[in-house]
Every structure is written in C-alpha cells, then in structure tokens.
Amino acid sequence: MPKIIEAVYENGVFKPLQKVDLREGERE
C-alpha cells in the first residue's frame, strides 16, 4: 500500500512537505 505524502512539484523538483525516510534515489 503506497504512502500518501504531501509534496509540491516546483521547478522540476519533487519537494516533500514533510520528512521522508527514503534514501537518495530510492523509490517506493
């Protein structure tokens, strides 16, 4: 089940609005 994470997509960059415990480059 995917996590729902609030985020904003700005200037081509995905910016989560809260701390996300994923390693750099990791996808879920």
From Swiss-Prot:
Please name one Pfam family that this protein belongs to.
AF2212-like
Where does the sequence pass through the membrane? none
Statement: the UniProt record of this protein carries the keyword Electron transport: no
Q: Does the keyword Oxidoreductase apply?
A: no
| UniProt xrefs under InterPro entries | AF2212-like, AF2212-like_dom_sf
UniProt KW keywords? Toxin-antitoxin system
Supply the name of the protein.
Putative antitoxin AF_1079
Protein's organism: Archaeoglobus fulgidus (strain ATCC 49558 / DSM 4304 / JCM 9628 / NBRC 100126 / VC-16)
